[in-house]
Amino acid sequence: MIEPLQPGDPGRIGPYRLVSRLGAGGMGQVFLARSPGGRPVVVKVILPEYANDDEYRIRFAREVEAARRVGGFHTAQVIDADPTADPPWMATAYIPGPSLRKAVTERGPLYGNNLRTLAAGLVEGLAAIHACGLVHRDFKPSNIVLAADGPRVIDFGVARPLDSSVMTQSGAVIGTLAYMSPEQTDGSQVGPASDVFSLGTVLAFAATGRSPFMADSIGEIIARISGPPPELPELPDDLRELVYACWEQNPDLRPTTAELLAQLSTDHTGDDWPPPHLSDLIGSMLPLGATTSPNPSLAIEPPPPSHGPPRPSEPLPDPGDDADEPSAEKPSRTLPEPEPPELEEKPIQVIHEPERPAPTPPRPREPARGAIKPKNPRPAAPQPPWSPPRVQPPRWKQLITKKPVAGILTAVATAGLVVSFLVWQWTLPETPLRPDSSTAPSESADPHELNEPRILTTDREAVAVAFSPGGSLLAGGSGDKLIHVWDVASGDELHTLEGHTDWVRAVAFSPDGALLASGSDDATVRLWDVAAAEERAVFEGHTHYVLDIAFSPDGSMVASGSRDGTARLWNVATGTEHAVLKGHTDYVYAVAFSPDGSMVASGSRDGTIRLWDVATGKERDVLQAPAENVVSLAFSPDGSMLVHGSDSTVHLWDVASGEALHTFEGHTDWVRAVAFSPDGALLASGSDDRTIRLWDVAAQEEHTTLEGHTEPVHSVAFHPEGTTLASASEDGTIRIWPIATE
């Protein structure tokens, strides 16, 4: 609501006289004001406590610059600004009109040529933004104002230059979840194609009155965004095809704004604006200059027309009352279905971290960065008595409080006017992985005689772990783009290997321990000389994140699986690609060599395990998993069995016959990691339920449950002697557990 000025509010900012409040946020205030000539303006002011922070001033200046670069034809034009003032402020033109969200929610969806005109106007706006070298990154219904002359795009608080490499922590994801692109949700590079994906989502909302990817949980929304597109019977065929094109998972396959404009201009003049059922709502917005009241109303809405859709206070008509089904070219008589308000339009700040599949959706995201925690997460497990208190690293946060905190976008909707402002603040520690001094044993300690697990901690998420063949070294991969190598006996960090430019997802030692392989979100596989702590080779060929790697038993080959849907074999001696293993239709999560080195197995989100001949690269067999996702894989030491993890179960296969042998049940969430003990008697599994479970393979029953991690477990590895087990978790720890074999 519009409120009177409060005691302590400034009477004037720059040359603008403030007349009322439009909204307050955690870091700023938005006022209604008048220019010296009496024109209505909206003034955004940063609170003094944040104005004293140089980082805030820089970010605010960037927002001003972004809005100015685009200009006023497609946006709320910046009239004036002073980012160096005390406090910093920006004045923008007042645009009479409701937000798209308000209009559709209160009056119903758009249809036919009205929808096409909206689409063309939005594409023009995005084209102008992209032509200035910017990406909006928060394109959604509440950031679109329906003015009398067409739609306007507002809020450049999260817009970012295409060539910008500063101002946001690497891997940070910004935006509103239900309108994000797949690359936004997992922290990938975001370009103009990301806005095009969001455009498709906005048009689907405008045509149906509901967010197409909305679901009951945040995890489900993520899964829907990266899954098959929903059906849209409400859209005419041409617009449905356009929206589906915008929703291509591969950003390179989405149409450009120029291509979209060319399609929308065919057989359409653009004269259908404003939509008839919205004309009174758009026309009712009175210019502020029309009143001299000290607290003028921005909008006066007349009673709804008798022929229009029902108002929200009226009962919704029963769909059964209509004899005819509503067509794609005429409005539905029902108002949009209500969406869960806490998920639909609440912007979030996402700190890039390894992603975990949601517990319930049919198609989880890869075990990758960018997982959003549920709105009501499980209570954190208490720290065991031997573990000292530690500061948790930043996680995905859904910021939905009325008083915004650092990183929240505040959108103020008052009588049809939407004014949005954004100020970001967050820091991510760059502290390297380090042994926890309170639990690390002395150099003389025997790691096999520990009563409690030893803990190596990090201020970033730990996502990969591997023992060297002799068991003296432990390697770990994390979100800091580094590989860390520790001495197992002392807990001292021996090496930090630098070279990857993104998350290190997987690590594996060669059979002789001389080399270490690593796979990363930078789409490369790298080989390292362990003794010299130097990079030996870089294998390039994948076009997306490398999710898993494995050394062949003789050390001559490295296998890799990627989000690009392929597995690849690399020749270690020559540094060349030996084979590209094609057949999966979705991400390849896991790869594993058979102990004799003749086969390599790959597991995919397509629900299959494929067995490949290493020498020829030909497919030998396909195992259809009972669950839809194969997230992790391992061969038994004798090669007779293959195990994979999926939803909340662990599945055991007979390799020779391809028959399923047993399903281990006990986990309550996705199983990201599996490993056999060196003697094959035990099977370890790590899960999003924050536990590691050991299973007796012969007895086909649970042996032990290891508890202590407070976040999902991404990787497990047995010590070569089988008496300890290492685990890596999103909680920032790598734990080395003693294993009782009796």
From Swiss-Prot:
Bilayer-spanning residue ranges: none
Pfam family, one: Pkinase
Repeat recorded as keyword: yes
Residues annotated as catalytic: 138
Keywords for this protein: ATP-binding, Kinase, Nucleotide-binding, Repeat, Serine/threonine-protein kinase, Transferase, WD repeat
SMART domains tied to this protein: WD40 (SM00320)
Keyword Cell membrane: no
Enzyme Commission number, as recorded: 2.7.11.1
Database matches in PROSITE patterns: PROTEIN_KINASE_ATP, PROTEIN_KINASE_DOM, PROTEIN_KINASE_ST, WD_REPEATS_1, WD_REPEATS_2, WD_REPEATS_REGION
Stretch list, region Disordered: 266-394
Chain segments annotated as coiled-coil in the UniProt record: none
GO molecular function: ATP binding; protein serine kinase activity; protein serine/threonine kinase activity
InterPro entries, A to Z: G-protein_beta_WD-40_rep, Kinase-like_dom_sf, Prot_kinase_dom, Protein_kinase_ATP_BS, Ser/Thr_kinase_AS, WD40/YVTN_repeat-like_dom_sf, WD40_repeat_CS, WD40_repeat_dom_sf
WD repeat coordinates: 455-496, 497-538, 539-580, 581-621, 622-663, 664-705, 706-742
Domain of life, per lineage: Bacteria
Catalytic activity: L-seryl-[protein] + ATP = O-phospho-L-seryl-[protein] + ADP + H(+); L-threonyl-[protein] + ATP = O-phospho-L-threonyl-[protein] + ADP + H(+)
Ranges of biased composition (kind: Pro residues): 301-318, 377-392
Residue ranges of every copy of the Protein kinase domain listed in the record: 16-266
Residue stretches of biased makeup (Basic and acidic residues): 343-356
Binding site for ATP: 22-30, 44
The family this protein is said to belong to: Belongs to the protein kinase superfamily. Ser/Thr protein kinase family.
Function: May play a regulatory role during the complex growth cycle and in secondary metabolite production.
Name of the protein described by the UniProt record: Probable serine/threonine-protein kinase PkwA
Source organism per UniProt: Thermomonospora curvata
